[in-house]
Amino acid sequence: MKLPIYLDYSATTPVDPRVAQKMSECLLVDGNFGNPASRSHVFGWKAEESVENARRQVADLVNADPREIVWTSGATESDNLAIKGVAHFYHTKGKHLITSKIEHKAVLDTMRQLEREGFEVTYIEPGEDGLITPAMVEAALRDDTILVSIMHVNNEIGTINDIAAIGELTRSKGVLFHVDGAQSTGKVDIDLQALKVDLMSFSAHKTYGPKGIGALYVSRKPRVRLEATMHGGGHERGMRSGTLATHQIVGMGEAFHVAKEDMAAENLRIKALSDRFYKQVEHLEELYINGSMTARVPHNLNLSFNYVEGESLIMALKDLAVSSGSACTSASLEPSYVLRALGRNDELAHSSIRFTFGRFTTEEEIDYAAQKVCEAVTKLRALSPLWDMYKDGVDISKIEWAAH
């Protein structure tokens, strides 16, 4: 077993060797290096053929038409293109947008930008289980609502929203529905023929593909129109200009193909690993699971260890690569905005650690990690006066601390 152990698969995943092999065939002079937009020679034709094959592979995983897949630089760009693209195209129909307080920053900051441009945004508060229900969305709808954007699987707590039910609601009201699917590909079945979803963002690097490439599903029936945010040579039917990165795209296609093949077996294996880990730490007192116990992916276990400061715990777990919050905001010492929105107090939000498991996690690593967590929590609590007070039966929430 090699140290440190990687348990941060929701931040990024390593590229699968099968994917790396396919990518390497698209780089060198002997390989498939042409520009897919070059129409006049075989180098361009071959590159275009590979790009279209990858488009089919991505579409196959989510049961979409390949013509509905638009290549982008990642899920952040897909979120921006979907939300700004819809807002700017349909602004004459209405200026109201709906999202939730626990979306990824790529959605929240895009919404904030649109607010500066004069749009109105309603931010739905999730339940304590971290879920956004159709009833919550319905309560936020107005006559001038043009778009609802709700994530499929939450990146911090791993909860799965019922996007089928939310889609039924939005479609019946004539409101467009965007879903951030960055964390759900390869973990949850997605059938875009059945789901009433108009736009969906995808990322390769959360699904054992390369970084720097993603896609946006843009429904053809019913047709969704977007205003482009990137202008140039009119690539991707005018929605996203820029020379297509053949090697990245081939990598994403292969990664989604592998995900489709392996998903059923892999989910069972990861559920077993997640259960194995939790069984070994659940004896710790004052341990809380963040997010719904039932509607969640097994890949994510977000735990709060009360009376232990999360950053101290991460330092103590030097052989484990884990995080407190999402990778995009983990440099900030503010408590997780996602956990705060769930109603967790500052102390519990600060004492949370996200363990995320994946394709290359082993039982041996799980056992080692669980043992280290138990040791570190016990040791840090032994140093904590608050833990002593709790053990003595003092209700710490009732204490009035004097200001210095």
Swiss-Prot record:
One of its GO terms (molecular function) is metal ion binding. It catalyses: (sulfur carrier)-H + L-cysteine = (sulfur carrier)-SH + L-alanine. Its EC number is 2.8.1.7. Pathway: Cofactor biosynthesis; iron-sulfur cluster biosynthesis. It comes from the Bacteria. GO terms for biological process: [2Fe-2S] cluster assembly. The active site is at C328. [2Fe-2S] cluster binds at C328. The modification N6-(pyridoxal phosphate)lysine is found at K206. Pyridoxal 5'-phosphate binds at A75, T76, N155, Q183, S203, A204, H205, T243. One of its GO terms (cellular component) is L-cysteine desulfurase complex. Its cofactor is pyridoxal 5'-phosphate. PROSITE patterns: AA_TRANSFER_CLASS_5. It is an enzyme of class 2 (transferase). It is found in: Cytoplasm. Keywords: 2Fe-2S, Cytoplasm, Iron, Iron-sulfur, Metal-binding, Pyridoxal phosphate, Transferase. Master enzyme that delivers sulfur to a number of partners involved in Fe-S cluster assembly, tRNA modification or cofactor biosynthesis. Catalyzes the removal of elemental sulfur atoms from cysteine to produce alanine. Functions as a sulfur delivery protein for Fe-S cluster synthesis onto IscU, an Fe-S scaffold assembly protein, as well as other S acceptor proteins. Homodimer. Forms a heterotetramer with IscU, interacts with other sulfur acceptors. Belongs to the class-V pyridoxal-phosphate-dependent aminotransferase family. NifS/IscS subfamily. This is Cysteine desulfurase IscS. The gene is iscS.
